[in-house]
């Protein structure tokens, strides 16, 4: 699949163009320069052609904490790309930063296709000299308005004209999981270690990752997509509009995932924010693995330390009692393999299908062995159970009247199912239904 990178100085509309090509809001857009810090990836489609699109941070000469990292990210993107969109702004005109980028592209991307694109032509005033644009040496250029969609058809035709027709089946085959956690627990370091490269900017300042980033990779011939997300802070501390949108992005990333890696910082006491983020994982009702990061930073460890930390986690995160716990040191690349062992272990449980006859044998016996308590004027009696298709093990239980069900008895039946069929590391869902009501498809 061909790769296209969008580069340019800050605030020329790179993220707006990225979103326009994808026809959805993937990159954060704000009139504040420097909003995009990392490389953002997604697959675009035009005229039955598929391509990987990369949004990058703005290149400038600056003493900003992140600027050297941003410039490095852009160079990574240029190296990955087959085609580069060099974006400038009709509204702001050409300045020294544009000229430096043009010079850099001639040096670093001399063997690649470079398309000069003039954005923001909806502006009433132009500050561009076309002779100056031709002097860059990139030949024909395209005038567009990413915000309003003007000129996009011609640009997209140019981008895909030499591309082969490609489908998107590979993307669909990948197992997708996301990394979540409060800021500065090491989510980006973990992503970088897994991917084996510096794809996500890592900085000691909490909140240095603002976008969620899809990264495709293979691990021992298995295909994965990992989503690195913005760290979630307590709502009262989020003041920037961009940060608010990043929190929403994290929640959306969870919705797109098949599994969650909840990262905790093992080198310090767990915080209230950790429990808040854990609540998001619980509410998502999908498989979750708890990752205790920075394990090597814990001093004076002994043979009992790991078990003590596990007990502490089980106490603070009671609602994730089924989630496996893995201990790693992302920066030192230690015990990373245990994450994938846990992922595959959990995947197998989540996909496990139980024969209806076996289910009924276990549940009907459990119902007879422990008589349910009377509740709301009646007593529950289970007639039948069947597993239904879902992302996690999900069961429909037919009974005489669901209103007679007490939560403690529902928990008893759930535990019996877990024990009998080995569902000890995934969430499971039970739906209690009146036996006279038909299931869809019956």
From Swiss-Prot:
GO molecular function annotations of the record: GTP binding; ribosome binding
GO biological process: ribosome biogenesis
Pfam families tied to this protein: KH_dom-like, MMR_HSR1
The keyword Chloroplast appears for this protein: no
The protein, known as: GTPase Der
Physiological role: GTPase that plays an essential role in the late steps of ribosome biogenesis.
Subunit structure: Associates with the 50S ribosomal subunit.
